[in-house]
């Protein structure tokens, strides 16, 4: 946590003194809560269970309640809620009854951004990594930004930090269309893909129009940074009536990458920018998708006057984000070791990008995947895409779908996914019942030199650390924060 530094003056929210977060342990909520704590507000919050996140906030002065009860919100001047919280929640019901304002998290983020130089990163994929890269490069350039990220920035040990400069860098969440609350000065659109379609009534055109509306929240002197490699971003570009800069591998992009070369975790490439000398950079993340994330960062850093030296330093020194191709360590097996990787990818596009990165960085190694689909609705809507991409693993174990509050949907489960993948004839997936200890199932499948990838947005996030500590893998070697083996 940043001590109570002198930051850009934050206009007082009139009578607001105590801010209560319903679901404060959520990744989108805790960061905003931490920044508000550092700004001097009283912060309280509730969640269903304690976690390292709630314990961290409590150590900084937040009052944490376990469980949702009406009295938790009694002293609040405003309630902050995520889209997962509805009016049946007793704290929300009490606030509404007492005429205490109830605002979505994005509206509170917009309030923080309103008086700062806001940089908002939107897109179906790559938001967290791109936001983190921008924060890293700005820090290397001495700009000390405030940031709110949807993942743990390894170098900072947190997903939010109050900086001393005018910059606020944050993710813009399209999943519930709440990014329309934001009014940044600079906005990034990394890509636009079919996800969270219930928010948009299943209408992809509505999703595209909402992204255009988000970009039109920019002032006339703002900047839209857009990935030209994404066909949908390219399609909406003529509709955006704001200054734009494009990036990608495409020859007609304003800022583009050439000479890409991957060596394990490191990716090297050359950046071409208008009226600039070519710039050779490297980033400690594999895959072309991370080259694109880096290009978005370079566009913004260049526009804000960050030196090339700081850009190179910020990218090369980037230590990654929690659960984004996070190397946990090495597991011992007969004849050698297996590299253990954890990743948050839960959309077929993200899964494909990670598999491609593994093939590019370690072409000689087998990929053993433990995958947990996230949400029955996503599994149903993108079923064929999941079948196609998961079939590219060498060995596949499929955990049952993580429901994320949804009821099961017939035909949208992991057992059926296994059958569909098996019918392709490429590999024979193994179905994993809910609650099964995976270590005894995984170990016999591993060979020396394999890469074991645990992937998904549900509780599979706890699998990699469990495997590292399992007695079946005694002698496992943990990686350092930046993913290097100790």
UniProtKB/Swiss-Prot annotation:
Highest taxon of source: Bacteria
One family name in Pfam for this protein: Mur_ligase_M
Cellular location(s): Cytoplasm
Keywords in alphabetical order: ATP-binding, Cell cycle, Cell division, Cell shape, Cell wall biogenesis/degradation, Cytoplasm, Ligase, Nucleotide-binding, Peptidoglycan synthesis
One GO process term, biological-process aspect: peptidoglycan biosynthetic process
Name by which UniProt lists this protein: UDP-N-acetylmuramate--L-alanine ligase
Record: residues binding ATP: 123-129
Cell wall biogenesis/degradation listed as a keyword: yes
Signal peptide (residue range): none
InterPro entries per the UniProt record, alphabetical: Mur-like_cat_sf, Mur_ligase_C, Mur_ligase_C_dom_sf, Mur_ligase_cen, Mur_ligase_N, MurCDEF_pg_biosynth, UDP-N-AcMur_Ala_ligase_MurC
Main location: cytoplasm
Main function: Cell wall formation.
PANTHER family, A to Z: UDP-N-ACETYLMURAMATE--L-ALANINE LIGASE, UDP-N-ACETYLMURAMATE--L-ALANINE LIGASE-RELATED
Matches recorded under NCBIfam families: murC (TIGR01082)
Family the entry assigns: Belongs to the MurCDEF family.
EC number: 6.3.2.8
Entry keyword Lipoprotein: no
Molecular functions per Gene Ontology: ATP binding; UDP-N-acetylmuramate-L-alanine ligase activity
One cellular component (GO) term of this entry: cytoplasm
């Amino acid at each position: 946590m940043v001590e109570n530094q002198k930051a850009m003056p934050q206009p007082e929210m009139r009578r607001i003194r105590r801010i209560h977060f319903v679901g404060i342990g959520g990744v989108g909520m805790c960061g905003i809560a931490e920044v508000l704590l550092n700004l001097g507000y009283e912060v309280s919050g509730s969640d269903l269970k304690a976690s390292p996140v709630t314990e961290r906030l409590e150590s900084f002065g937040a009052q944490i309640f376990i469980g949702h009860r009406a009295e938790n919100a009694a002293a609040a001047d405003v309630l902050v809620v995520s889209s997962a919280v509805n009016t049946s929640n007793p704290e929300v019901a009490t606030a509404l009854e007492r005429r205490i304002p109830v605002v979505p998290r994005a509206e509170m983020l917009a309030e923080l951004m309103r008086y700062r130089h806001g940089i908002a990163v939107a897109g179906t994929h790559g938001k967290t990594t791109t936001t983190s890269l921008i924060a890293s490069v700005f820090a290397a350039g001495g700009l000390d930004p405030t940031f709110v990220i949807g993942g743990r920035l390894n170098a900072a040990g947190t997903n939010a930090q109050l900086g001393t400069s005018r910059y606020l860098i944050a993710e813009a969440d399209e999943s519930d269309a709440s990014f329309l609350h934001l009014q940044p000065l600079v906005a990034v659109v990394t890509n636009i893909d079919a996800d969270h379609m219930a928010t948009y009534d299943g209408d992809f055109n509505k999703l595209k129009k909402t992204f255009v509306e988000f970009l039109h929240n920019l002032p006339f002197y703002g900047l839209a940074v857009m990935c030209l490699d994404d066909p949908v971003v390219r399609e909406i570009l003529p509709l955006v009536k704001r200054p734009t800069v494009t990036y990608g591998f495409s020859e007609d992009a304003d800022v583009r990458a050439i000479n890409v070369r991957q060596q394990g975790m490191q990716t090297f490439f050359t950046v071409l920018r208008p009226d600039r000398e070519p710039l050779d950079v490297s980033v400690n993340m594999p895959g072309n998708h991370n080259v694109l994330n880096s290009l978005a960062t370079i566009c913004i850093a260049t526009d804000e006057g960050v030196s090339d030296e700081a850009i190179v330093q910020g990218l090369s020194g980037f230590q990654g984000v929690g659960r984004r191709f996070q190397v946990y360590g090495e597991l011992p097996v007969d004849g050698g070791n297996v590299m253990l990787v954890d990743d948050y990818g839960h959309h077929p596009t993200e899964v494909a990008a990670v598999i491609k990165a593994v093939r590019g960085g370690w072409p000689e190694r087998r990929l053993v995947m433990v995958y947990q689909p996230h949400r029955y609705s996503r599994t149903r809507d993108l079923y064929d895409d999941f079948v196609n991409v998961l079939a590219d693993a060498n060995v596949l174990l499929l955990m049952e779908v993580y429901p994320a509050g949804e009821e099961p949907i017939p035909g949208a489960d992991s057992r059926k996914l296994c059958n569909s993948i098996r019918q392709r004839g490429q590999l024979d997936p193994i179905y994993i019942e809910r609650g099964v200890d995976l270590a005894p199932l995984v170990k016999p499948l591993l060979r020396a030199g394999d890469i074991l990838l645990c992937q998904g947005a549900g509780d599979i996030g706890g699998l990699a650390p469990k495997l590292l500590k399992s007695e079946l893998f005694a002698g496992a070697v943990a990686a350092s924060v930046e993913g290097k083996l100790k």
